[in-house]
Amino acid sequence: AAAQCFGVLSRKVSAEWVLEGDIQGCFDNISHDWMIANLPMDKVILRKWLKAGYVYQSKLFPSLSGTPQGGIISPVLANMTLDGLETMLAKRFSNAKWTGKKLQLVRYADDFIITGYSKEWLENEVRPAVVEFLAQRGLVLSQEKTKITHIGNGFDFLGWNVRKYNGKLLIKPSKANISAHLDKLRALINANKATRQATLIGLLNPILRGWANYHSHVVAKKVFNQVDNAVWEMLWRWAVRRHPRKTLRWVKDRYFKVQGARRWVFSCDEQSADGRKRQYTLVSASDTPIVRHIKIKAAANPHDPAWDEYFESRWGKRMLVSAKGRAKLYRVWLKQGGRCCACLKPVTKDTPWHSRHIVKLSHGGTDAVANLEI
C-alpha cells in the first residue's frame, strides 16, 4: 500500500487532493445477507463462519451482524466484501483517465484513499458513489473521520504520514503510530519493574523488531533513532529505580554494555537451562535497514507453477537484505563447494547468479538449506 501511494502521488502531475475513507465499524456491520448472496464461496461454510460468534470470559456471544470479532477469517471476508470498489469507480468514472480527473484508489482491507484533481469533485461526485457502494453492503462512511485533504498538508494512512514537502513526496511513520508504540513499550516496562533483565529483553524485542520491520520500507531512519533514544530513557529509569542506593556508574555497568562503538547497549549474560552462558541484547530500531519495497505483480499467483521463476527472483532479493538470509545463502554456497549447480563454474561476487528451490514451493518445497541451490 505504501508503494502504491508513492506511485500515484509522487509525480509532479499527480493528484493533489485525497479522500481519506474511514468505514464506521466495518467488521461489526457488514451485511450477512449481502455476503451470502454475493461472495463466491461455499454458502454452508460461509454461514457457519458468520454465525460462529466469539467466546469472552467463558461466555459465548453470538454474531448477529458483521464478521466474528478477532477471528482470523474476518479480515478476509471484509476484504472480499470491499473487493468491487475499484471496479465500481472505474465504471462510474470511465472517462476519468482521459479528462484529467486523476482518479486512483489505494486500499488495504477496510482502509482506503481515493485521489482526485479537485476537492469539489471528490466531495460531490466520488464520495456519493462510495457511500452508495457501501450502503449495499450495510456499511457507512464515518462523518467525522472521512475527510478530503491536500497532499501538501499530508494525511495518515496505515500508520504512516504521507505528505509532499516542496514537491517531494515523503512517507514516514505517523506521530500517532509512534506515540502508540512508545506508550505500549512504556506500559510493558512499568508492568515489569521487578522482572529480570533477560526476561524484559525477551518481552521487548518482538515488539521493537516487529514495529521497525513494518516501517523499514519508508523514510524512517530519523524516527528509528528517536525511538531508540526514548526507549533508552525508559530503561535507564527502570534500572535506576531498582537500585536506589547504588551509584549511577554502578547501574550503568550493571545493565548497559559496550558493543563496538556503542557504549550504552541494554544487555546481559545469563546461564541457560543447558548450562551455557547466553547473551541477551535489546534490539535497536536504528539497526533495521531501510529497503524500498518492490511491489508484487497483481496477477502473480504463488500456487501457479507458471509464476515459479518470478517468485524465486523476489525471494532471492529478499534473502540478500537480511543477515539471516545472507547466512543461509552462504551455507548453500559452501554446500556446493562454491560452484554453480548447473555448469559447475565458480560462483563469486563478480559472476551473475541466482538462487532457486530444488522442489518448488508450489509443489510443497521449503526454504530449508537442503532444498536450495545456486
Positions of the model-derived regions?
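Conserved polymerase palm-domain catalytic core
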Residues: A1-G154, G338
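A glycine-rich phosphate-binding loop feature that marks nucleotide/adenosyl-phosphate handling sites
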Residues: Q104-Y108, E144-G154, L203-I207, F224-W232, ...
